[in-house]
Amino acid sequence: MAPWPELGDAQPNPDKYLEGAAGQQPTAPDKSKETNKTDNTEAPVTKIELLPSYSTATLIDEPTEVDDPWNLPTLQDSGIKWSERDTKGKILCFFQGIGRLILLLGFLYFFVCSLDILSSAFQLVGGKMAGQFFSNSSIMSNPLLGLVIGVLVTVLVQSSSTSTSIVVSMVSSSLLTVRAAIPIIMGANIGTSITNTIVALMQVGDRSEFRRAFAGATVHDFFNWLSVLVLLPVEVATHYLEIITQLIVESFHFKNGEDAPDLLKVITKPFTKLIVQLDKKVISQIAMNDEKAKNKSLVKIWCKTFTNKTQINVTVPSTANCTSPSLCWTDGIQNWTMKNVTYKENIAKCQHIFVNFHLPDLAVGTILLILSLLVLCGCLIMIVKILGSVLKGQVATVIKKTINTDFPFPFAWLTGYLAILVGAGMTFIVQSSSVFTSALTPLIGIGVITIERAYPLTLGSNIGTTTTAILAALASPGNALRSSLQIALCHFFFNISGILLWYPIPFTRLPIRMAKGLGNISAKYRWFAVFYLIIFFFLIPLTVFGLSLAGWRVLVGVGVPVVFIIILVLCLRLLQSRCPRVLPKKLQNWNFLPLWMRSLKPWDAVVSKFTGCFQMRCCCCCRVCCRACCLLCDCPKCCRCSKCCEDLEEAQEGQDVPVKAPETFDNITISREAQGEVPASDSKTECTAL
């Protein structure tokens, strides 16, 4: 065996094991002494010990640290520091900051306006259909059906305020009882959360941002769904919301007040009313079975009218049909009387784009729907870009610490409740929970606000939107004051009950965990986000609606097995994660099921093949179609062919393969070869030279 190579300028390490004959400690120190004796230089000559060559046969995988995808990203500031700028640069930077602030406020203004126009577009497309849902008051006595109708109507009109006002009108007209209206209010609470979920889809381009944004949006959905699943059976059994609100209304003598204050609408209404104006009374009239309203258009044409009452002579079949005996006479063979007639005279038309087009409501709604979605998407992209350029370095650190930091011990538990108050106050200012949560979604996506902090803010928005409804109820006329106030209070106490269920105790904050799980799935399979929207906001409510119309026997016969299977799967999943040993070996995992029943990979392949033929055409059309293609096919480079998805997957698989770390090689020569410092063919030469 050849002697070990000696390296200059190396110290022997006494802690290292040096291989010798028969596995004993070699006499390296003696050799070192001899070498030192023969060395003519005064500088000490040292050696490095090399571990045995056979030790390189077993390579050790270095454990890779997996970053938590929910950690907030560090927004690095790559620009020039303020202290390093000259006077001209500081002035230019100052005006750039002012310009970015103006642009941010401008895009935020158009973002809010696009949400308002989006709501109007949905009302034009599905407003009359929503009114017809309420027209059959006999089926509203079914609480489950009332819940589903509340969800569908609010999704169609994109406004919980509109659906709530319809319910108030029906209750004040004695077409609906408060008891039957409470499930509808619960459904409206669910339906209004679809808006910020749609907004989250606009951040689908970046996987990490989409994971956070979609989870931040759907935490609102899960809170509402879980609250309904628990509180609806409790309300049906005890009617506690109806009893509490009735006691409150009867205990206080409320008087009619002034109209609810318009805060944000004062700024947005001058612009939105130039686009379109709607006559929202038509939906309420359809809900109250007014046949004349079915032929009316929701697009408002005349904004200024004059109503005049006059008396005219009319003929009647007999004197018994006269309005009054003193106002009845006979002229030959005809009987005459005087009747009060109301004339409505149109004076001035409204000033908006569609006032003179005379298009059907569906056409106007479709146009506004497409345009509002384009503006919404564009504004959101620009808001994210501007925030990303502003919130960097020290600014981002200060903002994230201010928003996400808890109070010092022992008052840390108060931080979340303060966030609830902030969310309620901000929602009261903007007068819409959809606007507040939709504005919150991009901030969650870019990593300024954590999911844990966004959760109490969202709960506060639920409270804030009910306070606006209470103020609006206090401004109602005398005949509708009592019913509208009781319904608004039902909405308020429903959200308070939900907060008491899913917030005070940390382990009960299930919406956060469920939203994070859905965010992880949607980030990996981005088409699943659209699937979630369709299933939870359309297919499930429509299925329950159809089964309810078929009768309670059909509903129970189909619903009970489905609920039983869901509960069984959840219990089995809980046992698999907590104590799998109590289960049979076959049930300790889901491998006994076919792959398509336990994984989304087969479904992802089907969706990719289905969208592959449309991908190239979609990418060549426009940027908006390109984003839709990215959403469906999970492809961030959609301006290429469908092969880019496969390339991306191969690249990700290549990154997932554990790489042997150079430090784990036992032989330093092999380690240097792995690092590329020494070619493999020259390793022997280097050892000889040493």
Swiss-Prot record:
Residues 1-100, 157-212, 384-407, 507-525, 574-689 are cytoplasmic. It is a multi-pass membrane protein. Highly expressed in lung. Also detected in pancreas, kidney, small intestine, ovary, testis, prostate and mammary gland. In lung, it is found in alveolar type II cells but not in bronchiolar epithelium. Signal peptide: none annotated. Residues 30-40 have a biased composition (Basic and acidic residues). Its main location: membrane. Residues 1-42 are annotated as: Disordered. Keywords: Cell membrane, Disease variant, Disulfide bond, Glycoprotein, Ion transport, Membrane, Sodium, Sodium transport, Symport, Transmembrane, Transmembrane helix, Transport. Disulfide bonds join C303-C350. It is found in: Apical cell membrane. Glycans are attached at N295, N308, N313, N321, N340. GO terms for biological process: in utero embryonic development; intracellular phosphate ion homeostasis; phosphate ion transport; response to estrogen; sodium-dependent phosphate transport. It holds the Pfam family Na_Pi_cotrans. Residues 122-135, 234-362, 429-485, 547-552 are extracellular. Induction: Down-regulated by EGF. The chain crosses the membrane at residues 101-121, 136-156, 213-233, 363-383, 408-428, 486-506, 526-546, 553-573. It is linked to Pulmonary alveolar microlithiasis: Rare disease characterized by the deposition of calcium phosphate microliths throughout the lungs. Most patients are asymptomatic for several years or even for decades and generally, the diagnosis is incidental to clinical investigations unrelated to the disease. Cases with early-onset or rapid progression are rare. A 'sandstorm-appearing' chest roentgenogram is a typical diagnostic finding. NCBIfam families: 2a58, Na_Pi_symport. Belongs to the SLC34A transporter family. PANTHER family: SODIUM-DEPENDENT PHOSPHATE TRANSPORT PROTEIN 2B, SOLUTE CARRIER FAMILY 34 SODIUM PHOSPHATE , MEMBER 2-RELATED. This is Sodium-dependent phosphate transport protein 2B. It comes from Homo sapiens.
